[in-house]
Structures are given as structure tokens and as C-alpha cells.
Design a protein with these regions (language model features):
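Membrane-interfacial helix termini and adjacent extracytoplasmic/periplasmic loops
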Residues: 1-4, 56-58, 102-113, 130-135, ...
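Interhelical loop and adjacent transmembrane-helix boundary motif
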Residues: 1-33, 65-69, 95-105, 111-130, ...
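C-terminal transmembrane helix and the adjacent membrane-cytosol boundary/short C-terminal tail
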Residues: 22-64, 170-171, 237-246, 252, ...
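Hydrophobic transmembrane alpha-helices
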Residues: 30-31, 81-85, 186-195, 219-230, ...
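Hydrophobic positions within alpha-helical transmembrane segments of bacterial inner-membrane proteins
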Residues: 33, 37, 157-169, 173, ...
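Cytoplasmic-entry segments and transmembrane alpha-helices of multi-pass inner-membrane transporters
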Residues: 58, 65-75, 166-202, 350-351
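Transmembrane alpha-helices
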Residues: 74-88, 189, 226, 233-236, ...
Length: 351
């Protein structure tokens, strides 16, 4: 339709018209704060349900009937195929095409048109569209960026998840306090700001003569942690509100210290929700581009490396990076599921 949004307009203005871009960022924040205020007002009279059994959720089953059961199953299968399976297959197939978008082998049925040059080329070849790049398996730029991405994502997840869990616990225990509402609102504030605006703010703050952290993992971790705290704090708060105070009060009567209460009582009861508070920042950080675009050079992490290869026209490399990110997320989610029994497959917080 050729329409623009505030966020896309902000990106187009940010490079040349920083003043106008800052005004747009403030407008977007005002909209976000207004929505958050409306949400808080609407939930003032909400009912709270707590648990004293150690189980924070329940499954409610509904009889869909024979027709409804199969109809919903077919719709879900189709949606899953086009939103999950087909994109992964497309990314994988793109890395074997001789030229971007060349699917001629489908109607010629000649698989010899497919190539593995994008994966296994070891030399700096300038012809065949490689632009002097090694294949994906031997490309040090990609794997160095992958290692850096994992480092940033793990650190952001650990720090943001821990801070968010503590915020959720503190707010839940002092839910009737005005300060608790203030802390909860401030913790959620970074979510209301556009990622590119947060990145620009950290660029101005930490890329100057006195403090220069540009193109360092430290700056990316700081920015990522601040941006992703709302994910962890919201997940932790919702889970902590479900725990009855009587559970912890019984432990306090027994003179059990706070750390032991957390690790032996609170965390085991809400294990799924707390782990979700760590997994959400981790997965978001892996694919983040807007936040880190101004804070590091191309090739420093995978998302900026993907942008670099897109500009070069090496779309097979971009597809491979997308595939690497997807597989990495699936592997980590599976490992967490197997090791802890908690997974995002069952929704935020699990069953």
C-alpha cells in the first residue's frame, strides 16, 4: 500500500534528521506509556488466584466434537507448515541454488543444477558469485560472529533473567506498595521504546571521547540487558503472583534464610516461568539487529553479518545465517527442555 509507520519513518529520519527522529521516538514512547497506563487501570480490580500446592497452572479441556477436532487440526497443520517448516526449508534450499532465486531444477528435474559451493569453498574465489569469500563452513567471519552472538545472548539472558526474576519477586511481595508499581513500570519502560532508539541512546552515551565502548561485547551486553529486562520481569511477576504467601511464611517461621527459600521453594515451584524469563531474552538477542546496528561494525555478530552479506548480494550466506540461528534456538530450547523439563513449547511458563 506504500504506507509508512512511526518506526519505519524513525529509521529513515535517524541518519540525517536526528531532531525529528527524536521527536518520533518520544511520540512512540508516549503511545506505549498510554497503553501501559490503560492496562494498569483496567487491571486494578482483577482477581488474583494463588497456589499452595506447588502447581501454578492447570489444563482446561474442551470438547470440540468430531468435525471441530479435525478442522482445527488441519488449520493448525497448515499454519505451522507455512510459518515454521516452509521458511526453514526455503532457507536451506537457498544455500544450494547456483544463483539466488534460481529454482529451475524443479521443472527440469535436474539436481545437477544444485551446488555446494556456498558451503565448502575453501579458496578466495572472485568468480561464481563468491566475491572472494570462503564457503560457509570455512568462513571465519561467520563463525567468529556466531561465537560473539552466543556470548552476548548468554550474558544478556543470564543478567536480564536474574534481574527480572528479582524484580518480579520484589514487586509481588510488595504488590500493594506505590514503590512496587513504580519499579514495575520502570522495568517495563525499555519494552515501550523502539530498539533503534535504545541503540542510538547507548551509542551517544558510550561512544564519545570520555567513554568509548563502541564495537565491544560489553556495550552490546549492557544494551541487550536493559532492553530485555521487561521480558524476564513480566514473566517472573506473573508467576510470583500465583504463589501464596503462606508457602514462604511457613519457611520464615522455620528460620530458613532467603537464599534457601528462593532455591529450594520459590524457584522449584515456578521453574518453568523463571526459565522462560531467561529463554526469551536469549532467543530475542540471537536475532536482534535494530538494537545492535549502531553499536558495532558489520561482521561483529551474526545479525550485522547477515546485513553485510545482504548488501553484497550473497543471499545464500544470509539464508545460511538465518538457518544457523533457527537451528541454534531449536537446539537450546530442546536442551533446556530435556535438562529442566521446562520449555517454551508449552507457552510462557509451561504447563
Amino acid at each position: 500500500l506504500g504506507l509508512t509507520t512511526l518506526s519505519t519513518k524513525y529509521i529513515s529520519l535517524n541518519s540525517k534528521y536526528t531532531g525529528e527522529a527524536s521527536i518520533l521516538a518520544i511520540i512512540m514512547m508516549i503511545f506505549g506509556v498510554a497503553i501501559l497506563t490503560m492496562n494498569q487501570v483496567s487491571l486494578k480490580s482483577r482477581k488474583n488466584y494463588t497456589t499452595v500446592t506447588g502447581k501454578s497452572g492447570q489444563l482446561s479441556k474442551m470438547n470440540l466434537g468430531k468435525v471441530g477436532k479435525y478442522a482445527i487440526a488441519v488449520v493448525m497443520i497448515i499454519l505451522t507448515f507455512f510459518t515454521s517448516i516452509f521458511p526453514i526449508f526455503s532457507f536451506a534450499l537457498e544455500t544450494f541454488l547456483p544463483n539466488p532465486g534460481d529454482y529451475s531444477f524443479l521443472y527440469t528435474k535436474d539436481l545437477s543444477n544444485l551446488t555446494t559451493k556456498w558451503w565448502i569453498t575453501k579458496e578466495n574465489i572472485t568468480e561464481n558469485g563468491m566475491y572472494g569469500q570462503h564457503g560457509i563452513l570455512y568462513n571465519s567471519t561467520i563463525w567468529h560472529a556466531f561465537a560473539g552472538t552466543l556470548l552476548v545472548a548468554v550474558c544478556c539472558a543470564l543478567i536480564a533473567g536474574t534481574i527480572g526474576t528479582l524484580i518480579g519477586y520484589a514487586v509481588a511481595k510488595n504488590r500493594r506498595s506505590r514503590w512496587a508499581s513504580y519499579v514495575n513500570g520502570v522495568a517495563f519502560l525499555p519494552y515501550l521504546m523502539p530498539s533503534i532508539a535504545v541503540g542510538a541512546a547507548f551509542f551517544i552515551l558510550f561512544s564519545n571521547e570520555k567513554i568509548n565502548l563502541f564495537n565491544t561485547y560489553t556495550l552490546l551486553i549492557i544494551a541487550g540487558t536493559i532492553k530485555y529486562i521487561p521480558f524476564a520481569s513480566r514473566s517472573a511477576l506473573n508467576s510470583m503472583l500465583q504463589i501464596s504467601n503462606e508457602i514462604e511464611e511457613a519457611a520464615i517461621i522455620q528460620d530458613i534464610p532467603w537464599t534457601k527459600r528462593m532455591f529450594r521453594i520459590i524457584i522449584p515451584i515456578q521453574k518453568s516461568a523463571i526459565i522462560s524469563g531467561y529463554m526469551l531474552p536469549f532467543m530475542t538477542c540471537l536475532r536482534e539487529l535494530s538494537l545492535f546496528l549502531l553499536l558495532c561494525t558489520q561482521g561483529f555478530i551474526l545479525s550485522t553479518t547477515l546485513d553485510y552479506f545482504d548488501e553484497m548480494g550473497l543471499y545464500a550466506f544470509s539464508s545460511a545465517i538465518n538457518l544457523i540461528l533457527i537451528v541454534t534456538i531449536l537446539i537450546f530450547n530442546t536442551l533446556v527442555n530435556k535438562l529442566t523439563g521446562a520449555s517454551l513449547d508449552d507457552g510462557i511458563g509451561g504447563n
